[in-house]
Amino acid sequence: MDKKASRIRRATRARRKIAELCATRLVVHRTPRHTYAQVIAPNGSEVIAAASTVEKAIREQLGNTSNKAAAEAIGKLIAERAIEKGITNVAFDRSGFQYHGRVAALAESAREAGLKF
């Protein structure tokens, strides 16, 4: 089993547990160049809020989109957008990625901005 298949297996297991809770989830995905975050409805069919380093305003503001500072900015932005829509409690879905580096930075800044998980 390769690295990607292992990550997807971990993500599937975590998503199954989150689905049992019927909780709104904050999903994080990272690539070598960008970081993405989405708040997804409990039924999984609706994206309530989204933020990523692909957005032009974020790219211009940050310069480098693949570091912890960029992840912190995305965490703050996704929290603001979710709170705007009335979502304060979420389940954190790290998509099988290690809770370290950019994933942890995004989570901590989202917590500081007001999301509870």
From Swiss-Prot:
One of its GO terms (molecular function) is structural constituent of ribosome. GO terms for cellular component: cytosolic large ribosomal subunit. The keyword Ribonucleoprotein applies. SUPFAM superfamilies: Translational machinery components (SSF53137). One of its GO terms (biological process) is translation. It comes from the Bacteria. Keywords: Ribonucleoprotein, Ribosomal protein, RNA-binding, rRNA-binding. InterPro entries: Ribosomal_uL18_bac-type, Ribosomal_uL18_bac/euk. PANTHER family: 39S RIBOSOMAL PROTEIN L18, MITOCHONDRIAL, LARGE RIBOSOMAL SUBUNIT PROTEIN UL18M. Part of the 50S ribosomal subunit; part of the 5S rRNA/L5/L18/L25 subcomplex. Contacts the 5S and 23S rRNAs. This is one of the proteins that bind and probably mediate the attachment of the 5S RNA into the large ribosomal subunit, where it forms part of the central protuberance. NCBIfam families: L18_bact (TIGR00060). Belongs to the universal ribosomal protein uL18 family. This is Large ribosomal subunit protein uL18. It comes from Aliivibrio fischeri (strain MJ11). The gene is rplR.
